[in-house]
C-alpha cells in the first residue's frame, strides 16, 4: 500500500510517498512543489497541476493532509486554506480517501512528543525511512504526515486488508 502525505503551503507544498507492508515502511519519493505566478489563481492552478502529476506518477492508495492553524494574519490564513483545498481536492479527485491530522498529532505519532521541533521530526523521519534524502523541510513534514497515517491505518488493520486486495490473483496491481 502506498500512502501520500501532503504538507500544504501556497508557495511551497511538501509531498511524500511511502510504501507500507505490514509494519514495514519504505520511502518511495518526496519533493516540494513551488507555486508559479504572482496572482493567487495562478499559484493555485500551479499547485493543482503539479500535485496532480505527483498523484498520477506515484499511484498512492491513500492520502493524508495536515490541518492548518489559524494565526493573527487572517489574509495569510485564508490563502493557506485555499492551498489546503487543493491538497484535499487532488487526491479526492483521484478517488483516494483523504485523512486529516493536526500538526501536534503528527509530531506525537512520529516523534512521541506533540510539540517536537522541526529538527526532531526530520531526524525521526530519517530513522524510520533509512536512506531517505529529504527534498526540504516541507517534504520532511509531508513524509511525517504519511507515516502518521500509516500508523493510523495499521492500528485499524486497514494495511493488511488493502495489501491482500491489491496482491489478489484477480489481476489487481501488486503493492511494492
UniProtKB/Swiss-Prot annotation:
Homodimer which binds Holliday junction (HJ) DNA. The HJ becomes 2-fold symmetrical on binding to RuvC with unstacked arms; it has a different conformation from HJ DNA in complex with RuvA. In the full resolvosome a probable DNA-RuvA(4)-RuvB(12)-RuvC(2) complex forms which resolves the HJ. It comes from the Bacteria. Keywords: Cytoplasm, DNA damage, DNA recombination, DNA repair, DNA-binding, Endonuclease, Hydrolase, Magnesium, Metal-binding, Nuclease. The active site is at residues 7, 66, 138. It catalyses: Endonucleolytic cleavage at a junction such as a reciprocal single-stranded crossover between two homologous DNA duplexes (Holliday junction). CDD domains: RuvC. PROSITE patterns: RUVC (PS01321). It is found in: Cytoplasm. The gene is ruvC. Binds 2 Mg(2+) ion per subunit. Mg(2+) 1 binds at residues 7, 138. Belongs to the RuvC family. The lineage of its organism: Bacteria, Pseudomonadati, Pseudomonadota, Alphaproteobacteria, Rhodobacterales. Mg(2+) 2 binds at residue 66. The RuvA-RuvB-RuvC complex processes Holliday junction (HJ) DNA during genetic recombination and DNA repair. Endonuclease that resolves HJ intermediates. Cleaves cruciform DNA by making single-stranded nicks across the HJ at symmetrical positions within the homologous arms, yielding a 5'-phosphate and a 3'-hydroxyl group; requires a central core of homology in the junction. The consensus cleavage sequence is 5'-(A/T)TT(C/G)-3'. Cleavage occurs on the 3'-side of the TT dinucleotide at the point of strand exchange. Its EC number is 3.1.21.10. This is Crossover junction endodeoxyribonuclease RuvC. GO terms for cellular component: cytoplasm; Holliday junction resolvase complex.
